[in-house]
Regions:
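Short helix-to-loop capping/linker segments positioned immediately adjacent to catalytic or ligand/cofactor-binding
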Residues: 4, 17-23, 101-107
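Short, structured patches in soluble enzyme cores that scaffold and shape functional sites
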Residues: 19, 118-119
Length: 120
């Protein structure tokens, strides 16, 4: 059902977030994510490749994966957006609820932006 987080993604520890270069090449990255309603939230840095690629092409693919990025389930289409600073607190709370390590100041020191993923 469009807009809902697939059951294969809910409750997973990691997802493989696939973004696309301008030439169409796929780049997959295993990431932590938080869930809230029908959205996923990912923490990252604004100078990371995935953030730059999402600014150019908001279409992404999402699949459950291992810590090393080995995909363990079906892949789903989603749309991603880089959140403005006023929406960071909400994304941070979603991630903090899931990962105790995310609450450590050291983790957030290097994080300066968040992504919101919506399933198509």
């Amino acid at each position: 059902m469009p807009g809902n987080i697939p059951s294969e993604i809910r409750g997973q520890k990691y997802i493989s977030l696939t973004t696309f270069r301008k030439n169409g090449a796929k780049i997959a990255t295993p990431v932590w994510f938080g869930e809230d309603g029908d959205k996923l939230y990912v923490m990252t840095r604004s100078d990371m490749g995935k953030t730059k690629r999402i600014r150019n092409n908001s279409q992404v693919r999402v699949a459950p994966c291992s810590i090393r990025g080995k995909v363990t389930g079906p892949e789903y289409s989603a749309s991603a957006r880089v959140l403005p600073p006023e929406e960071h607190a909400h994304a941070r709370q979603a991630i903090n609820r899931k990962y105790w390590m995310a609450r450590l100041p050291l983790i957030w020191r290097r994080t300066d932006t968040y992504l919101e993923l919506s399933f198509l």
